[in-house]
Amino acid sequence: MCIRDSYKWVPIGYHGRASSIGVSGQVFKRPQGQTKAPDAAEPSFGPSKRLDYELELGFLIGRGNALGEPIAIGEAEEHLFGVTLLNDWSARDLQAWEYQPLGPFLSKNFASTLSPWIVTMEALAPFRAKFERPEGDPQPLPYLDAPSNRAAGALDITLEVLLQTAKMREAGEAPARLTLGNTTEAAYWTAAQLVTHHTVNGCNLQPGDMLGSGTLSGPKPDQAGSLIELTLGGKQAVTCLLYTSDAADDTPC
C-alpha cells in the first residue's frame, strides 16, 4: 500500500464513537487540526476554515444480535427501533489532509448532532416506498435482496436544510432554505440493507447502536446534503436571503 505524505505528520486513524454525539442545538467549539495548503511545503495546525454539515438519517437499533450471528435482510427491520435526523459535522480542510488511506478522523470526531426526537418504524409505516435501483445500475447481491425490501424497503421522507445567520436571527427573520429533497431520490441503500451488511460477518449490534445513512443528496443541485456539494467544492457561492434593512437582498451567505 502506498503511504501518503500525511502519514509522516499526523497519527492516522479511523474510528466510530458515541462520546461526542449530542442533541441538536448544542454549542461546540470550532474543530482544530492539521491542514495543508496546496502551495505549502508543510502542514500547519489551527482551527478549521471549512466547517460543513452532512444531512443524514440515523437508524437506531432496538434489538441486537449475538456475536457471530448475522441478521438476514428479511428480519433486519425487526431489529430497528426508529429513525432520527443526524448531522455528521465535518471539517473539510482537515479531512482533505488526513483521510488517506483510512478515512476521516479529527475531521469528524468533534461533534455529531441528533434530533431530540426518534420516530419509530411503526409510525413510519405510511411513509414507505419501493426500493428500486436506477436503470443501468447493478442489482444487490442475494444477501442484500428480499421481496419485502423491494416492495417497501425505502422511506419516503422530505429532507430539508435551513440556514439562519446571526444577522437573520437579530432581525427576527425565518431561516433560508438551502436544500429540499426526498429520501426516495437520495438514499441508495435501505435501512434493512445497512443492518444486514453491518452484521453479515458476525458483528453484533446492541440496543441503542446507531447506523448513519451517509450524506443524503439527490440528483438535482438544490438537493445537495452538504455545503461541499452545494458549492461544488467552494467554487460556487451559496445565495440566501439576508435582511439588512427594510429591503431584502440576495447576498452570498
Regions from the PLM with identified roles:
Residues 188-200, 206-207, 211-245:
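Active-site pocket scaffolds in enzymes
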Residues 56, 88, 209, 246-250:
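Acidic active-site catalytic centers that drive phospho-/nucleotidyl reactions
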